[in-house]
């Protein structure tokens, strides 16, 4: 059976959208998912299923609504896709603090207009790379006051999206089987050409293809 990484958007933030992980694990197992594991309280789940990723997404969304009465958006990646996200790592040379390095997982690719808006929002030493259905964003100063982060965390992207810091991304790869197994098996999917926004001498940012 295939292993999937299931990412929930916006749960357990303060008193809003509360979902207990033990109860969620039980519900997923009752729904015929196997080897169900969770990481932290922010909605990071690894499951095994014969279903395709899109079917897994719909099934988890429906289950959460039925069991917990919440409409929660879900993004799913196969374990090979998530391992490819880590292997790609376009900010490896500059992102020294994993808590300030965010990956935004998208249900679908962004429009060219939205990509340009993200690139224009990167300020100072911030960097952003859009690669397929992921956005890699490095916020070296502060995430809280970042216009780039505000765009990524908001609802103006035009697609379902949810973000995780680099520590969580790497932990989920390990939980799903580890990067070494994928490299040995040649199981990684080829990365799409990235579009990036990085600082330049003239305007603090430059577009790198």
What label would you give each PLM region?
Residues 2-209:
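Surface-exposed, charge/polar-rich loops and edge strands
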